[in-house]
Amino acid sequence: RHFDWDGRLAPTNLATDAEILAVASVVDEVGVGVIQVGGDQALGKQIAEVSGRPVFYGNITQQAVAPDRWRSRLAEAEEMLRRGHRAYQFVMPRPGDLRYTLKTAQHFDALPSWKTVMLMSLDDRKEAFRDPATRAKLHFEAVETPLNPENAGEFSRRWDLQFVFQPALAKNENLTGKSIAQIAEEQGKDVLDVFLDLALEEDLETEFERREVNSDEEAMSVLLNSPHTIIGQSDGGAHVVFRTDYSYSTYLLSHWVRDRGIMSLEEAIRKLTFIPASLFGLLDRGLVRPGMVA
């Protein structure tokens, strides 16, 4: 949900679908402009149908919680374009790595006991993490309970994809780059005990990293090369506590072009410049041509 500078909900949070579709239906009369829709894919497709303008209605990711869901999302994008609608989904070239500490983590919020603990003061939170009864509840939710893959925001239970990114204490530097599952196996401990014990030892300053999104490079190669997707989807620094996405263009050029060779340099430049410029109606840029913006 988004708010304006005065703390009021943005109009799009309050408008009905009918009102949004009514506004979208006259955008094409102006002859310029694009529409972005976040979250509601069904509404995004309806807007594409009534507006006649380019619509960006989400992003396709490869996710550990549902490893093959991207295939149906890509087929959906292809079908929309076949029907003549300029409806596109973004693909982020970077892995969706999120770095966090147990002072700031949000990705346990769909688990009720975790959410309760994470809303506590830091001192109370540390006491809760130490409490055996509370830890048993946290273990039940984050280790024992099966994942619901339909809940996109739910913690994956993939402790092999939760890594120690930066320990706070020099004595724990040897854990850098190891997954919680790997450390648990090496120490003969439960994954949750490893996770919480390390965080508590370092006063919740341990920086972890979750690598659950866009980690399958074969799937990503298909998505990035698809003519039905648009490369992009930086958050512009909105979640800088957890990640910074502004490097997506250089990551495409360095990792995917130079290191992996999944497309030519020329094609990558076209996908980063000419294609988005054309879709956004910026017709004076995107090509190296006399009179165009450099």
How should these model regions be labeled?
Residues 206-214, 220, 265-269, 277-294:
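Acidic, glycine-enriched loop/beta-strand segments at the rims
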Residues 2-27, 37-261:
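Active-site neighborhoods of metal-dependent hydrolases
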Residues 33-35:
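Conserved divalent-metal-coordinating catalytic cores
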Residues 30:
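Catalytic histidine neighborhood in serine/cysteine hydrolases
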Residues 252-278:
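Gly/His-enriched, cation/cofactor- and phosphate-binding structural elements
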